[in-house]
């Protein structure tokens, strides 16, 4: 039997740079495996020092989970309380660096920090930085050792959370307070109970056979998409360029859903087969990198709607869904600052007007990100996913050949027609960007600390869209983002069947299940963007007023000094 590792031992190992993750009662050291992880290293870094049982079970099949256990270095025989991972600002000390030799609670090492401190980012020397740490010190909204509760007044006064005097920060504090009011207590025992009920739910869904994929439904999807491509190419031959471009855009929109399913290994549940399907439809036919999407999306699923860590809501300078983004946050995903610069200060206050127009150009940005991922080798370079990079490089090149050369260059008679065909076909895909952002943009962006359970975070940060079953194909499974975030490997055509079980679970644990109609959901998103825009406008106006007052004060001060000097000179004369 493996030895029991104390909390202090585990903290010491993390301080030494080891990738320590808790799975059930096992302590895993993933140092040797992380470089082979198909989902990249960032997703694992966010689990260091935490009980990742629910996350690991949700994203991996039983065969993969069995492989994890070869990295077991010990076990725990006591209730585990999550530590704050280094990538999120957790601070750890080695045993020989501590003054005391008794039991050590790693969660109580942070000092309270005010918002002014948190904005003073300090670069960490490379030699002093753990592999999982960001280049700069990250100061979490909720410090280590703090379990958020409804009694925030004392926290505000002590600046445990943030200085409430600052307008935008006060707005964010109010959102945190709302979440603490509307969701179950973050007490460790309560969150563990919610997690245990979630595991029972997972068992029910598995027993109901909902992980079995219905391939007849996928045949219908391929026939529908193939028909759209066929109509597009037929109309192209007739020189009906505009309608051809619209059909092509709609086909791309539907194709994204197949790639999404394959990326989650929810079609055949075979890693290589699903990835080949996903890469083929995404890159060869759509010109997008599945590898880029997976690297991004895996992190999004683990730290959903966190302004500092989730790349899916980091859209500055165009959009801000949280006032925290007004303060030049350091993105731990992109490893760079997200500057709230002059351009962002012009755009964000009117973002609710620009939302749909900007989404019309979303696909062009995906091209850029896809090529960067492949050319810079940002995906796995070792293990069973290493060859994906070269497959996608060939695929993206082929897409540019068939679309931009064979269709745009060879089939279009003039540059004006070429431009119109490209723009119409790409704007037609705008609806998928609406569907993607609809699920999360209006939902909570609060950081509620490390005690929050996996199911509660997913329910708090995700929204479903209500639609009749016959229209499910249009949304491609994205209308069930709540259920999908709880069970990412569940085949999309079974999500609706799981809905009643999820609603029953939500009723039992007291967590709101958010669902709106498509139009109502869009209204909620626009309303939220408008609220954030108003906060940006207010903050910028305050800054402008303060600057003017400071200038006026300086002017009057200089004026009085000058007058005094003149009077003094006259006296001397």
UniProtKB/Swiss-Prot annotation:
Motif (Histidine box-3): 481-485
Short sequence motif Histidine box-1: positions: 260-264
Renumbered ranges of motif Histidine box-2: 297-301
Chief location of this protein within or outside the cell: membrane
Entry EC number(s): 1.14.19.18
GO CC terms in record: membrane
Top enzyme class: oxidoreductase
Ranges of residues in domain Cytochrome b5 heme-binding: 2-77
Protein name: Delta 8-(E)-sphingolipid desaturase
Organism this protein belongs to: Kluyveromyces lactis
Gene encoding the protein: SLD
């Amino acid at each position: 039997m493996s030895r029991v590792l104390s909390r202090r031992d585990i903290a010491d190992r993390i301080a030494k740079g080891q990738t320590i993750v808790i799975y059930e009662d096992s302590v895993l050291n993933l140092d040797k495996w992380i470089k082979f992880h198909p989902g990249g290293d960032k997703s694992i870094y966010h689990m260091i020092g935490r009980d990742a049982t629910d996350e690991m079970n949700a994203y991996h099949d039983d065969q993969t989970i069995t492989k994890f256990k070869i990295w077991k270095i010990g076990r725990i025989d006591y209730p585990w309380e999550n530590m704050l991972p280094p990538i999120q600002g957790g601070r750890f000390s080695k045993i020989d660096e501590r003054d005391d030799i008794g039991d050590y609670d790693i969660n109580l090492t942070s000092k309270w920090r005010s918002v002014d401190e948190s904005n003073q980012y300090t670069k960490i020397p490379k030699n002093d930085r753990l592999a999982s740490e960001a280049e700069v010190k990250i100061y979490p909204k909720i410090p280590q050792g703090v379990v958020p509760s409804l009694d925030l007044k004392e926290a505000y006064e002590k600046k445990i959370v943030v200085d409430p005097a600052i307008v935008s920060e006060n707005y964010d504090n109010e959102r945190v307070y709302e979440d603490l009011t509307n969701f179950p207590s973050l007490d460790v025992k309560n969150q563990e109970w919610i997690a245990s009920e979630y595991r029972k739910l997972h068992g029910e869904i598995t027993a109901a056979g909902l992980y079995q994929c219905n391939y007849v439904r996928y045949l219908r999807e391929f026939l529908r998409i193939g028909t759209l491509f066929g109509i597009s190419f037929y109309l192209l031959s007739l020189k009906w360029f505009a309608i051809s471009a619209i059909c092509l855009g709609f086909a791309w929109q539907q194709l994204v859903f197949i790639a999404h399913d394959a990326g989650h290994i929810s079609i055949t549940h075979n890693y290589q087969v699903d990835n080949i399907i996903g890469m083929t439809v995404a890159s060869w036919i759509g010109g997008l990198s599945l590898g880029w999407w997976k690297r991004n999306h895996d992190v999004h699923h683990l730290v959903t709607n966190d302004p500092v860590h989730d790349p899916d809501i980091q859209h500055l300078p165009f959009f801000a869904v949280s006032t925290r983004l007004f303060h030049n946050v350091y993105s731990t995903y992109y490893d760079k600052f997200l500057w709230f610069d002059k351009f962002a200060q012009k755009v964000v206050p009117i973002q609710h007007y620009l939302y749909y127009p900007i989404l019309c150009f979303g696909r062009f940005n995906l091209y850029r990100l896809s090529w960067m991922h492949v050319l810079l080798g940002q995906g796995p370079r070792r293990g069973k996913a290493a060859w994906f990079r070269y497959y996608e490089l060939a695929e993206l090149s082929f897409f540019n050949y068939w679309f931009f050369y064979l269709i745009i260059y060879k089939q279009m008679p003039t540059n004006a027609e070429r431009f119109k065909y490209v723009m119409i076909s790409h704007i037609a895909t705008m609806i998928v960007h609406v569907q993607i952002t609809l699920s999360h943009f209006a939902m909570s962006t609060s950081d509620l600390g490390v005690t929050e359970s996996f199911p509660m975070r997913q329910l708090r940060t995700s929204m479903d869209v209500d639609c009749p079953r016959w229209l499910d194909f249009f949304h491609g499974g994205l209308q069930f983002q709540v259920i999908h975030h709880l069970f990412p490997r569940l085949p999309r055509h079974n999500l609706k069947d799981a809905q009643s079980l999820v609603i029953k679970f939500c009723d039992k644990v007291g967590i709101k299940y958010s669902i709106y109609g498509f139009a109502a959901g869009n209204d909620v998103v626009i309303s939220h963007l408008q609220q954030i825009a108003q906060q940006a406008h207010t903050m910028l106006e305050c800054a402008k007023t303060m600057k003017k007052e400071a200038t006026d004060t300086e002017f009057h001060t200089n004026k009085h000094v000058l007058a005094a000097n003149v009077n003094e000179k006259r006296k001397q004369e």
